[in-house]
Amino acid sequence: MSTGAQRAVLAAAATAALALGVAACGEEHESTVVEGEPLELGELSFNVQLTRFLNPDDTEDSEYLEGLAVPPPGEDYLAVFMDVENEGDEATTLPSDGEVEVEDTTGAKAEPVETDSLFALQLGEPIPAGGEIPTADSAAASGPVQGSFLLFLVPEGVTENRPLELKIRSHGEEGAIELDL
């Protein structure tokens, strides 16, 4: 092989190696899915089934909001119903309060509202190997949506800044679920 051909082969190999290195540098453990598709973060799979505003004056919704005050003027309760599966061989924990938020296109964020509802997803709780939340024998699993919910207090006009995303950090990985509102 001539010197010019060797240089061309070496240049092509160097370019390919550089491109691979640059691509790997930007690689993050973040993914985005749409509501209804599972978001895989480590061993946990998060699947949002339904997102909707809750009305404290509605009979069904009042059960979800039991013990909570009526939202202040200009704000609404937003419920994100989901199930979570631990697809791993070991027990793990759900993300904590500070690892879950709803964000709109302006960057405005809302953190989960603490609730004692039987239907609520209890952040930070353990989930056994192969386990699923809600558990089969729970109120959330037998409820109308058959999922546990996270509750957020958001401004009334938040739908003007769609899409909203549920952002989750879990065990060193990050992802987002685009909510269907």
Locate predicted features:
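Conserved functional micro-motifs across diverse proteins
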Residues: S2-G4, L18-G21, C25-L181
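Bacterial N-terminal signal peptides that target proteins for export
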Residues: M1-A12
